[in-house]
Amino acid sequence: MNTVANADFNGIVMFERSHRENDLLVKFLTKEHGKRMFFIRNAKKVDFKLRSAILPFSHGQYTGLIRSNGLSYINAALDVQQFENIFQDITLNAYATFVLNLVDAAFDDNVKITSWFERINRALILIDAGNDAEIITDLIQIQLLNSFGISITWDHCVICGRTDLPLDYSEAFGGMLCQSHWERDEHRWHLKPKSARIIGILSAVSIFKLGQISISKETKQEIWNLTADIYKNQVGINLKSRSFIDQMKKWEI
């Protein structure tokens, strides 16, 4: 049975898609109802009053008809803002888009994921405020892996549990190996010690308690390459938004 309820909800606009000549399908990440697709009639008309409230990266409180299955509908925007810097800056936009794409891939639609709504909202706030977008994205990537069914031990050796020796990532062992056990996997990643330490921190720290982390461009790239490999070979996804960031990095060289 497809139940319908008129309700207020907190949401973040993930993306929009054209539907027919004048309509849009707009996907929201909501606090109360998970990821939902909303049908917005006449949204492409120039005089549509809610247009600014349904642009990508708009966020706030809305009211509408929430259907348990199929498309939902928005009646009004009650208190909506825009992540202005993300919306206007191509680099921030790219990382924020990738973060939202990851969440879209990790969870089914119409399933309540309140804790992840809160984390993603915090990530976007931090990115919009000028914090290191790549580090915030790495944190989300690493912590989302469990939601894809990938459990990795990041903070100690999977064989002996030691934390006092340099660690390196081993796909074969599903986590870190300490220096005493590196010979067990000749195909380990050969991470630099600082990269391994930063990954351990990002895997465990709450995004609500994340402070300033000073990381070199080389270290960030090493972490980025590792997560790309894990998502491609273990999760089985290679998002276009990641490829765009890779291309964007080449522009900076």
From Swiss-Prot:
HAMAP family: RecO. Transmembrane segments: none annotated. Belongs to the RecO family. It comes from Pediococcus pentosaceus (strain ATCC 25745 / CCUG 21536 / LMG 10740 / 183-1w). This is DNA repair protein RecO. It holds the Pfam family RecO_N. Involved in DNA repair and RecF pathway recombination. Keywords: DNA damage, DNA recombination, DNA repair. InterPro entries: ARFGAP/RecO, DNA_rep/recomb_RecO_N, NA-bd_OB-fold, RecO, RecO_C. The keyword DNA repair applies. GO terms for biological process: DNA recombination; double-strand break repair. NCBIfam families: reco.
